[in-house]
Structures are given as structure tokens and as C-alpha cells.
């Protein structure tokens, strides 16, 4: 389990994160939700070590934040010019002692042989996104961190993406992801955390959130003319 205790972060005297305390449980799929500017990406950057925090502490009892155990998909996907998809795969495979096969990589991306031989920067936005996701899986990570993973994907590709996530969950991969799509949160999350104005406003299982949620009914009077 990864424990964050009283994490705070500010930029130019503006509090982006304020006293964040959460647990990212092993073998659990956790959704981090919130509107744009809520601090989700900043929190992700702090967890993976790309950003320093002003105060607080992070305890990684399972050593999941080891770079060889962690796969990361950042919010923005960019590839260098003139490097082919197959070359990217071989490059990423060289970083690990154990890694997914060429066949497994093609299953995740659903790329044809022609696309595997194509320059990555020439793929469509959705194809680049699924490629970036597949590269995050090359080293068979125990922890997967995904920042807005399905942005730029069409409906069919998003469906395939979540089918892959379901298989990873069955293999007990620990997953933390951010999303704006409520159906993805309802379908995949074991735990939901809502970040708003730099603070955790909600941290619970989806079924408990549904059970405790209150609904309002608004009656609007209408007059009909005969």
C-alpha cells in the first residue's frame, strides 16, 4: 500500500494541494476524479516523483514506486519524429529484464504489421494514446498510474482499453487513474477519490457512494392549452 500523509503543494503562494491524506491499496483500482484544475495531475506527478511537495510524507510499504515495478501514462502523449512503433517497443524492452512479447504488444495496441512499421508521430491521436499505454505495460508493472488515459480515443478504442484494464485487474495489478468519464469510474473503480480545490472531498467505494447519495426531485408546473 502507498500512503500519503498531509501532502501539501503550492505554486506562487497558490495552494494546489492542501493536507492530502489517502491510501492507494494494493491490488485495487482507484479512480481519482475532479474538475480541471482540481490538482489531479499535480498529485500524480508527486506520487511518481516528478514533482516535489512542500510538506507531508509518502510511505511506500510495498515498494511499488520502484521504477521497475511502475508503469506510467501521463496526460499528454508525445513521440519523437522518425522513430517507428516497433523501434519504440524494442527500446522499452531493453529497459527491463522481463517484458511483454511482440505478440502481446500487438494485442494491446491492435496494430497491424503496417502500423508497427509506421512512425509513431504519424499515428492518429487515439492510436498514439493506446501506443503510449502499451509502452507503459512493456515491463509488466505491478503498479499502473494513468492520467486521463482514454483522452483522444474513440468509443471502440475506449472499450478495448477497459477490456485490457479488466485483465490487469484479474492479475492483481494496482491501478490509479484519473478520468472525466463517469461510466469508466462506475465500471472499473474499486475506490473513488474526489479532489476539489486541492482537497480530498470524497474517498469511498462506488457502491457506498451510490447508497449514500441523496437525490432531489424538482417539480416544474406546466400549463397546457387545449
Predicted regions and their residues:
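Conserved ABC ATPase signature
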Residues: 119-123
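The feature captures the beta-strand-to-loop junction immediately N-terminal to the Walker
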Residues: 33-35
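Hydrophobic anchor residue at the start of the ABC signature
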Residues: 133
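Conserved ABC transporter NBD signature motif
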Residues: 49-68
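Catalytic Walker B motif of ABC-type/P-loop ATPase nucleotide-binding domains
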Residues: 144-148
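Conserved structural motif at the start of ABC-family nucleotide-binding domains
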Residues: 2, 17-19, 67
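ABC transporter nucleotide-binding domain
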Residues: 162-226
Amino acid at each position: 500500500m502507498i500512503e500519503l500523509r498531509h501532502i501539501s503543494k503550492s505554486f506562487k503562494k497558490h495552494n494546489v494541494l492542501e493536507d492530502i491524506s489517502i491510501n492507494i491499496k494494493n491490488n485495487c483500482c482507484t479512480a481519482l476524479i475532479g474538475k480541471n484544475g482540481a490538482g489531479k495531475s499535480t498529485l500524480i506527478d508527486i506520487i511518481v516523483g516528478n514533482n516535489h511537495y512542500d510538506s507531508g510524507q509518502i510511505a511506500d510499504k510495498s515498494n511499488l514506486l520502484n521504477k521497475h515495478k511502475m508503469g506510467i501514462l501521463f496526460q499528454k502523449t508525445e513521440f519523437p519524429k522518425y522513430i517507428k512503433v516497433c523501434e519504440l517497443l524494442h527500446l522499452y524492452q531493453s529497459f527491463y529484464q522481463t517484458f511483454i512479447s511482440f505478440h502481446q504488444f500487438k494485442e494491446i495496441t491492435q496494430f497491424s504489421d503496417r502500423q508497427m512499421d509506421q512512425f509513431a508521430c504519424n499515428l492518429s491521436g487515439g492510436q498514439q494514446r493506446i501506443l503510449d499505454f502499451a509502452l507503459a505495460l512493456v515491463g509488466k508493472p505491478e503498479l499502473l498510474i494513468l492520467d486521463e488515459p482514454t483522452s483522444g480515443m474513440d468509443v471502440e478504442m475506449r472499450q478495448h482499453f477497459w477490456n485490457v484494464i479488466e485483465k490487469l485487474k484479474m492479475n492483481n495489478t494496482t491501478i490509479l487513474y484519473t478520468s472525466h468519464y463517469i461510466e469508466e469510474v462506475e465500471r472499473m473503480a474499486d475506490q473513488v477519490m474526489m479532489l476539489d480545490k486541492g482537497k480530498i472531498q470524497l474517498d469511498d467505494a462506488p457502491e457506498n457512494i451510490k447508497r449514500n447519495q441523496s437525490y432531489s426531485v424538482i417539480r416544474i408546473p406546466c400549463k397546457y392549452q387545449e
